[in-house]
């Protein structure tokens, strides 16, 4: 019999809590106790993912984004933590600690682009390294293709939408940071990167990055992070071979792209 705490210990080995940012809320956030035979790995715990876990008879969901982040002042049937407890499904959420972890979100992202001689930046969260020389538009197309192949397909539209800023030079040294990392363009420049690939970047990040000679690729928050779910599932299976670990097929990008 595998317990909730055994899985939590295994997840702490995969993504040590001491790697988390001080403002974050990772950990065992919903504990329904009991034995666990099957786990669902996801990026987000949405009502659709809870329903999927229940349908697949999973007693636990392991996610990247915390199902509880801000303090709860009230809770009801429309709230996902309520839905988890009602279904008897526990939740372990590993957020910024999984971003920074060895083999975590950003190392998985770096691996997609075959980065070599990797270093960390942004307080250990991001990764920067050498890649085979490539033009920015070609790298953006590669990001769209490779990430789409690793994400759940939407019901309508393309799986991944990529925006890019071309500073006019080929990319030999790439910085990656998943999610909302556009504000870290100066950190990428300080590490000698030619391009920063992230999930989200705003209008002013794009203008400033180009002005300073850094190309920027924004490939989507979901698309840059969902690929880690397969890696987490594989690590958890290796740690607890008797545990069945599935990857969510219902956890999709919340946006629909034209």
Question: Predicted regions: what is each one?
Answer:
Residues 1-258:
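Hydrophobic structural segments
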């Amino acid at each position: 019999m595998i317990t909730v705490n055994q899985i939590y210990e295994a997840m702490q080995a995969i993504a040590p809590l001491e790697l988390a940012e001080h403002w974050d809320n990772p950990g065992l956030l919903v504990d329904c106790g009991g034995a666990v035979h099957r786990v669902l790995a996801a990026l987000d715990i949405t009502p659709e993912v809870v329903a999927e876990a229940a349908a697949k008879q999973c007693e636990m969901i392991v996610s990247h984004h915390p199902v509880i982040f801000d303090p709860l002042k009230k809770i009801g049937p429309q709230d996902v933590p309520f839905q988890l407890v009602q279904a008897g499904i526990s939740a372990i959420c590993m957020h910024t600690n999984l971003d920074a972890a060895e083999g975590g979100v950003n190392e998985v992202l770096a691996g997609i682009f075959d980065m070599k001689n990797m270093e960390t930046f942004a307080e250990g969260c991001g990764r920067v390294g050498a890649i085979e020389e490539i033009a920015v538009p070609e790298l953006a197309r590669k990001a769209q293709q490779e990430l789409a192949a690793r994400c759940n397909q939407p019901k309508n539209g393309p799986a991944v939408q990529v925006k890019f800023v071309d500073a006019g030079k080929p990319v030999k040294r790439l910085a990656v940071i998943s999610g909302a990392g556009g504000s870290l363009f100066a950190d990428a420049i300080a590490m000698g990167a030619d391009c920063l690939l992230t999930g989200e970047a705003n209008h002013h990040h794009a203008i400033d990055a180009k002005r300073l000679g850094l190309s920027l690729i924004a490939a989507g928050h979901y698309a840059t992070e969902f690929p880690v779910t397969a890696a987490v599932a594989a690590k958890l299976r290796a740690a607890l071979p008797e545990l069945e670990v599935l990857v969510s097929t219902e956890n999709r990008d919340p946006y629909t792209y034209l």
